[in-house]
Amino acid sequence: MRFLLANPQVVLRLLLEHIGLTGFSLLLAILIALPLGWLLHNHRRLAGPVLSVLGIIYTIPSIALIIFFIPVFGLNARSVLVALVLYCQIILVRNVLAGLDGIDPAILEAARGMGMGTW
């Protein structure tokens, strides 16, 4: 507690760095997960293998995954960013897929009747 009170500038800088890294990794993860979930929804054969690989990645301890990326990206925020994006994928892709699968077919039919296209 003494360190926090004695160094508020350092704590604030590190807090903002942490929030920025987390927010940026979540943004990247969403940009990857939405099209991937849509692809898996349209190509059901791929859903099982892709979700299995993402599940296996999710079981790797976080520190081990970050250490695995250090030789590839170096000892910097990029290693952490890649690990965070990979960890988010199983959660996001599975939920995007569940959301798309949960759309009532009657709603899709009504939307097509009103002119909805593929996108």
Placement of each model-derived feature along the sequence:
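Helix-loop interface residues and adjacent transmembrane-helix termini in multi-pass membrane transporters
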Residues: 16, 42, 72-74
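Hydrophobic positions within alpha-helical transmembrane segments of bacterial inner-membrane proteins
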Residues: 22, 26-38, 42, 89
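Hydrophobic residues within alpha-helical transmembrane segments
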Residues: 27, 31, 53, 82-86
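Cytoplasmic-entry segments and transmembrane alpha-helices of multi-pass inner-membrane transporters
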Residues: 36-69, 84, 94-98, 102, ...
